[in-house]
Regions:
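A short, N-terminal "cap"/entry segment at the start of jelly-roll beta-barrel domains
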Residues: 1-37, 45
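Glycine- and acidic-residue-biased ligand/ion/polar-headgroup-sensing regions
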Residues: 31, 50-76
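Conserved GNAT-family N-acetyltransferase fold
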Residues: 36-38, 63, 88
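Short beta-strand segments in beta-sandwich/barrel cores
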Residues: 43-44, 68-73, 96
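Conserved short histidine dyad/triad with adjacent acidic residue
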Residues: 35-56
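Ligand-binding loop in jelly-roll beta-barrel domains
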Residues: 91-117
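Short beta-strand segments
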Residues: 34, 78-80, 105
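Short acidic-glycine-tyrosine-enriched beta hairpin
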Residues: 74-93
Protein backbone atom coordinates (compact mmCIF):
# COMPACT_ATOMS: atom_id res chain seq x y z
CA UNK A 1 0.00 0.00 0.00
CA UNK A 2 1.34 3.44 -0.92
CA UNK A 3 2.02 6.17 1.61
CA UNK A 4 0.55 9.64 1.46
CA UNK A 5 3.04 12.20 0.15
CA UNK A 6 3.06 15.91 0.93
CA UNK A 7 5.11 18.82 -0.36
CA UNK A 8 4.75 22.56 0.13
CA UNK A 9 4.97 25.24 -2.56
CA UNK A 10 6.62 27.52 0.02
CA UNK A 11 9.61 25.15 -0.34
CA UNK A 12 9.58 24.32 -4.07
CA UNK A 13 11.85 21.69 -5.59
CA UNK A 14 12.72 24.19 -8.31
CA UNK A 15 12.08 27.85 -9.09
CA UNK A 16 12.44 29.05 -12.67
CA UNK A 17 12.64 32.82 -13.01
CA UNK A 18 12.15 34.73 -16.23
CA UNK A 19 11.48 38.38 -17.09
CA UNK A 20 8.46 39.61 -15.13
CA UNK A 21 7.67 36.21 -13.65
CA UNK A 22 8.53 32.88 -12.11
CA UNK A 23 7.21 29.37 -11.72
CA UNK A 24 7.70 27.40 -8.50
CA UNK A 25 7.63 23.65 -9.05
CA UNK A 26 7.09 20.66 -6.79
CA UNK A 27 7.35 17.06 -7.95
CA UNK A 28 5.46 14.24 -6.27
CA UNK A 29 5.79 10.88 -7.97
CA UNK A 30 4.63 11.33 -11.57
CA UNK A 31 2.96 14.69 -10.84
CA UNK A 32 4.73 17.98 -11.49
CA UNK A 33 2.75 20.87 -10.04
CA UNK A 34 3.50 24.55 -10.52
CA UNK A 35 2.59 27.91 -9.05
CA UNK A 36 3.19 30.61 -11.66
CA UNK A 37 3.39 34.32 -10.88
CA UNK A 38 3.29 36.85 -13.71
CA UNK A 39 3.87 40.57 -13.10
CA UNK A 40 2.00 43.36 -14.92
CA UNK A 41 3.55 43.84 -18.36
CA UNK A 42 4.41 40.14 -18.77
CA UNK A 43 3.75 38.71 -22.23
CA UNK A 44 4.86 35.21 -23.27
CA UNK A 45 6.09 36.34 -26.71
CA UNK A 46 8.23 39.08 -25.13
CA UNK A 47 9.42 37.37 -21.93
CA UNK A 48 9.73 33.66 -22.76
CA UNK A 49 9.87 33.20 -26.55
CA UNK A 50 13.64 33.73 -26.70
CA UNK A 51 14.22 31.42 -23.71
CA UNK A 52 12.03 28.59 -24.98
CA UNK A 53 12.86 28.91 -28.68
CA UNK A 54 9.40 28.28 -30.14
CA UNK A 55 7.16 30.76 -32.00
CA UNK A 56 4.40 30.36 -29.41
CA UNK A 57 3.93 28.52 -26.12
CA UNK A 58 3.76 24.80 -26.92
CA UNK A 59 2.94 23.69 -23.36
CA UNK A 60 -0.48 22.29 -22.47
CA UNK A 61 -1.86 23.95 -19.35
CA UNK A 62 -4.63 22.75 -17.03
CA UNK A 63 -4.88 25.32 -14.31
CA UNK A 64 -6.62 27.46 -11.75
CA UNK A 65 -6.29 31.25 -11.42
CA UNK A 66 -5.91 32.58 -7.88
CA UNK A 67 -5.53 36.29 -8.64
CA UNK A 68 -5.04 38.72 -11.50
CA UNK A 69 -6.15 38.45 -15.11
CA UNK A 70 -4.55 36.92 -18.19
CA UNK A 71 -5.52 37.13 -21.85
CA UNK A 72 -4.79 34.07 -24.00
CA UNK A 73 -4.67 34.15 -27.80
CA UNK A 74 -4.47 30.84 -29.63
CA UNK A 75 -2.40 30.57 -32.82
CA UNK A 76 -5.64 29.68 -34.62
CA UNK A 77 -7.11 33.06 -33.58
CA UNK A 78 -9.50 32.41 -30.69
CA UNK A 79 -9.02 34.55 -27.57
CA UNK A 80 -10.16 34.36 -23.95
CA UNK A 81 -9.59 36.13 -20.64
CA UNK A 82 -9.09 34.16 -17.44
CA UNK A 83 -9.25 35.48 -13.89
CA UNK A 84 -9.76 34.62 -10.21
CA UNK A 85 -11.66 31.38 -9.68
CA UNK A 86 -11.37 30.25 -13.30
CA UNK A 87 -10.33 26.67 -14.04
CA UNK A 88 -8.91 26.45 -17.54
CA UNK A 89 -7.51 24.15 -20.21
CA UNK A 90 -5.15 25.79 -22.69
CA UNK A 91 -3.71 23.59 -25.44
CA UNK A 92 -0.30 24.16 -27.05
CA UNK A 93 0.06 26.96 -29.59
CA UNK A 94 -0.74 30.23 -27.82
CA UNK A 95 0.51 33.59 -26.63
CA UNK A 96 -0.64 35.15 -23.35
CA UNK A 97 -0.28 38.41 -21.47
CA UNK A 98 -1.29 40.04 -18.22
CA UNK A 99 -4.29 42.36 -18.24
CA UNK A 100 -4.31 45.22 -15.73
CA UNK A 101 -2.00 46.26 -12.94
CA UNK A 102 -2.31 43.23 -10.63
CA UNK A 103 0.06 40.23 -10.77
CA UNK A 104 -1.56 37.02 -12.00
CA UNK A 105 -1.04 33.91 -9.87
CA UNK A 106 -2.13 30.56 -11.30
CA UNK A 107 -1.63 26.91 -10.43
CA UNK A 108 -0.70 24.62 -13.33
CA UNK A 109 -1.49 20.93 -12.98
CA UNK A 110 0.03 19.73 -16.28
CA UNK A 111 2.45 22.25 -17.78
CA UNK A 112 4.96 22.82 -14.98
CA UNK A 113 7.35 20.04 -16.03
CA UNK A 114 8.55 21.91 -19.12
CA UNK A 115 7.32 25.50 -18.69
CA UNK A 116 10.01 28.17 -19.19
CA UNK A 117 12.54 25.57 -20.38
CA UNK A 118 14.22 25.41 -23.78
CA UNK A 119 12.16 23.28 -26.16
Amino acid sequence: MADTIKKNLNKPDETRTFPKGKIEVVKIGDLTFGKATFEPGWKWSECLKSIVGTKSCMVNHNGYVVSGRMHIKMDAGSEIDIGPGDVFVCPPGHDAWIVGSEPCVAYDFTGAETYAKKA
